[in-house]
Amino acid sequence: MRKKVLLMGRSGSGKSSMRSIVFSNYVAKDTRRLGATIDIEHSHVRFLGNLVLNLWDCGGQEAFMENYLSAQRDHIFRNVQVLIYVFDVESREFERDLVTFRNCLEATVANSPQARVFCLIHKMDLVQEDLRDLVFEERKAILLETSKDLETTCLATSIWDETLFKAWSAIVYTLIPNTPTLESHLREFAKAAEAAEVILFERTTFLVISSYSSESNPATDAHRFEKISNIVKQFKLSCSKMQAQFTTFELRGGNFSAFIVPYTEDTYILVVIADPEIESAVTLMNIQSARRFIEASKSASDGIQLQP
């Protein structure tokens, strides 16, 4: 099952940097050595079982953009599931970028009218902290008005914090065909295991696929999942540099315990238990039981097939 994703935006806006961090295990400081994308770079990323992201990273130089919108228009914009357009928040040519974005939208509507659009207002770390919300909301209002013919989501991003993982988790979530089923499984598992929270991560990228939070244990940090994605991925990279393999993580505090363990061939699961009296062995046994159940469910469906 292939899903075509276009990654577009002006040259230097940060498209290839974010792609390299999310899918190629780069750290933010190493993206400085990346050169400009020439024409189109194709990546086929096997994301979950039989789901393949067919990612088209389109070079943003003006000559390339003109070609995309003329000679290659039908070829590029046909059968697109998601258009990701990256805006450099510090660009001094926002109006010009907006014209190009509008042209890309017209091509998308003509060739892939059911596509979803994600506008990433990028490099937000360069904006003064107390002005970030204001700047983002101003740009968001303009972009939503411009893209009203397509379902559009605007997100603020930076390669230096968890916002990058939050944005790409949101994008990938729209491409997964059976998220209601996954959410139902996690909810039932959480109730059976008496878990405060359960989060499912894709194994390679550590993007959030699905989650469940108990109403009896409300969380205080809305960005906790993406922060965990970022932290664990950095830890996995550190393990790789030391020629060590990240397998399982367990943390026990005074009033909680947390486990990150392999769930299926394609996923990790994070389970947070608020009752400190529940033994680790019980939680791990519950995870093993749930693993068998979800594998059986997926193998019987036409959606993502998670293999042991």
Swiss-Prot record:
Q: Which CDD domains match?
A: RagA_like (cd11384)
- According to its UniProt record, the EC number is 3.6.5.-
* Gene Ontology biological-process annotations: cellular response to starvation; negative regulation of autophagy; negative regulation of cell cycle switching, mitotic to meiotic cell cycle; negative regulation of TORC1 signaling; positive regulation of TORC1 signaling
Q: How does it sit in the membrane?
A: Peripheral membrane protein
What is its subcellular localisation? Vacuole membrane; Cytoplasm; Nucleus
Function of the protein? GTPase involved in activation of the TORC1 signaling pathway, which promotes growth and represses autophagy in nutrient-rich conditions. Also required for TORC1 inactivation during nitrogen starvation.
Name of protein: GTP-binding protein gtr1
Q: Species name for this entry?
A: Schizosaccharomyces pombe (strain 972 / ATCC 24843)
